[in-house]
Amino acid sequence: MSFALGQRWISDTESDLGLGTVVAVDDRTVSLLFAASEENRLYAKHDAPVTRVMFNKGDTIESHEGWSLDVEDVIEEGGLLTYIGTRVDTDEANVVLRETLLSHQIRFNKPQDKLFAGQIDRMDRFALRFRALQNQYEQHKSPMRGLCGMRAGLIPHQLFIAHEVGRRYAPRVLLADEVGLGKTIEAGMIIHQQVLSGRAERVLIVVPETLQHQWLVEMMRRFNLHFSIFDEERCVEAYADSENPFDTAQFVLCSLDFIRKSKRRFEQVVEADWDLLVVDEAHHLEWNQTKPSREYQVIEAIAEETPGVLLLTATPEQLGHESHFARLRLLDPDRFYDYDAFVEEERQYQPVADAVTALMSGEKLSNDAKNRITELLSEQDVEPLFRIIESSAAEDEQAQARQELVDNLMDRHGTGRVLFRNTRAAIKGFPQRNLNLMPMPLPSQYATSMRVATMMGGRMTDEARAMKMLYPEEIFQEFEGDSATWWQFDPRVNWLLELLKENRNEKVLIIASRASTALQLEQALREREGIRGTVFHEGMSIIERDKAAAYFAQEEGGAQVLICSEIGSEGRNFQFANQLVMFDLPFNPDLLEQRIGRLDRIGQKRDIEIHVPYLQGTSQELLARWFDEGLNAFGETCPTGRAVYDKFADAIIAILATGKSDGLESLIEESATLNKALKSQLEQGRDRLLEVHSNGGDKAKEIAEQIAATDGDTNLVNFALNLFDTIGLNQDDKGENAIVVTPAENMLVSSYPGLPYEGCTITFDRETALSREDMNLISWEHPMIQGGIDLVLTEGVGATAVSLLKNKALPAGTLLLELVYVVDAQAPKQSGIARFLPKTPIRIMMDGKGNDLSAQVEFESFNRQLSPVNRHMASKLVNSVQKEIHGLIDKAEISMEERLESVRTDAEKEMKAALNSELERLQALKAVNPNIRDEELTQIGNSNERTIWLYW
């Protein structure tokens, strides 16, 4: 090492000091001043851990005055370097810049500059960086991107709808699955895909106020999408940042009532630029041809300004054909412009549905059925398929011919592209519901307090009185005080204790209407029998609820009982339990179905036991009988329940308000008759073609199988743990597929993306994550992985490395140079270019003669043969072969250009094939089905042209 005053060096061990200047040299030591950090360092001259900073022709360097110079020549004189070139800011030529006057805060951005400046990283970090690039590329190319990372079971019909809709440009669809089939999850998967692909950057979700928390939790816990709830208070706070408060967040969640009640907020929502609008409970948007409701007009105004719209409703169109048309009108007002025309068009589609029913039955096709199919499809297309169906061909061949006819008929279906509806009748695998009604005597304490409350009721409305009489424990506490221990004499509590003792090995979910009841029940179970239980109510934070749910889910040492309030249980499902206790009853059938739906969902493997204790001679008994005998709402899902309730609401409320059974028998009889008629109407009106289209058939199963095959990916596990090690996160293996990850003091960064300050528990196993709500399911799409990859690539981790290869077949001193180039097409995310040309790593390995060995030498096997070198020694080795490395980099550039051309060509072919195929299919469909939107065709055509232009 030769030192001279004024030379510039960089520390190998403390690169954050900046660029140092030699200020003193003697026989044994050298002293450097690091002006940027105002530090001095004294080193032993013969082995100083520093590297000389030398720039070359073509580099751009910065002076201490702030201007930059494009280097055209380098002169060395007296051990000091002088750079000559052109100033970037003034274009002045032949400008001289001595190395002593270089910027003290110089940064090395190119990997080769870092290498020559001694900023050399470890080999394991270089390997991590390459794997990060490789995995990022593979994930962007995956056709399942956006579907693999959700914390949800792999339900085929949900995955099919999400896959079908999520890839569209600005999807505008109606999701109308029956209760319990997962519309919220379908919407979340679509949102997730749209966000990951860049098609949607700003999303607005509008829901009823009572469902805000449910949506917030579902989006965060299942999809790692962090929405902000906007109310008046949040809007006022946001004024400091923007005139329009809705511009201050990318993902916004608010209630329909909030927007409807304030003209100002409504106008601000409409003015904000949204990419995707999601509306839950869309059947509440009332409409008729003369006077649409205010709620409908609000959503209509937002939908007109928003490219993508998802409407969610569980109400079948047969129960309100006009409102069904109104929802479709929100999606495409040009297509659905006239109700009478729509009714006539729907009537014309009936033969299509009849033909599909005939095909799917597997029975011999009648002449009528064949004639109907021939009217809808061309004769030359169907005749060969008819011959196969009627021949003695193998069953598989016949089934394939029937399926091909069904597929062709689907393309002509009126609303098949904008409407998806799955029914329990069409999707198998749901458990039985077993009802256990438990009548109990009314305690005298309750009888007295209820009698007094009735006398003191004054001008209370019938509805308020009916609601009050359902909860006698609350009436008792009104007179005796909040501390009154009603649970000491309530027979429902004694019965519950016996039930829990008889079923000690079962998890039991208890739901009560009020949070106060839930809390006092937990106290009663704990104090009277020492039963392990936990509560779940709206007064708890999301983290507290997660912990309670996790405690309940825990198999060993967990809670036997989870006691929920009505609101607190929204959006939470506990399929691992099959025992449901309704300590009291909700006021309407929708809430009753919501309660049972906590357990009765796809994924439930056992029959559900529904226990309903009630006090005889009270409103509880009357309501239980009406739900059971009038609706059969306990025994099966009741899509007609709300319609029946609305019809008889006045009579129901009047009976519940008095607590007397006068008129109950006739009410039950009339309700049962109407319920049966409505269900029959639903069954007759079932659109089997739509159901077949919505559940996806074999294609849906293939999607589920593809995703299942990626679960438990050992490559992901190894990469994630290696990533966490490199960043410096603490990892504590807790067993049961669980690892606790927490921030450490000496991390590479101050905070890690996606990791809370207090840390979190992670798992790579989907089933574990589904049963443990306190765990994060780690996938390639999780923020901790995506954020970690971005961190590695942006922070320069592993940009350079030096290693030794111990191989007797190679002579000592053999130089191998491994380079990784990244093809990065700069374009807006919305362009969709990442689908065909994501960031693509090109690996080149040069031997000393300039031959590219990358095809013969695979990265991982080569990496396993390498031994680490300390940084100081690595810097010396690099300096000794710096000239050779420069030459090899020049040759590698030529090889890279050839490979780049191949990458471009392949991407262009793939893009043309995909987009042209998609465009041709949609154009052909538009000829027979007007539900293909012109905007979608235009967008695909524009994407095609724009993407070709971007490549060249």
Swiss-Prot record:
Q: Which Pfam families match?
A: Helicase_C (PF00271), RapA_C (PF12137), SNF2-rel_dom (PF00176), Tudor_1_RapA (PF18339), Tudor_RapA (PF18337)
Q: Which SUPFAM superfamilies match?
A: P-loop containing nucleoside triphosphate hydrolases
Q: Which BP terms in the Gene Ontology apply to this protein?
A: regulation of DNA-templated transcription
Annotated Helicase ATP-binding domain residues: 164-334
- Annotated ranges, domain Helicase C-terminal: 492-668
Q: Decide whether keyword Transcription is in the record.
A: yes
- Residues binding ATP, per UniProt: 177-184
State the EC number(s): 3.6.4.-
Q: Would the keyword Thylakoid turn up in this protein's UniProt record?
A: no
Short motif DEAH box, span:
280-283
The record describes its quaternary structure and partners as:
Interacts with the RNAP. Has a higher affinity for the core RNAP than for the holoenzyme. Its ATPase activity is stimulated by binding to RNAP.
Name the family the entry cites: Belongs to the SNF2/RAD54 helicase family. RapA subfamily.
Q: What does this protein do?
A: Transcription regulator that activates transcription by stimulating RNA polymerase (RNAP) recycling in case of stress conditions such as supercoiled DNA or high salt concentrations. Probably acts by releasing the RNAP, when it is trapped or immobilized on tightly supercoiled DNA. Does not activate transcription on linear DNA. Probably not involved in DNA repair.
Protein name, UniProt field: RNA polymerase-associated protein RapA
Print the organism lineage: Bacteria, Pseudomonadati, Pseudomonadota, Gammaproteobacteria, Vibrionales
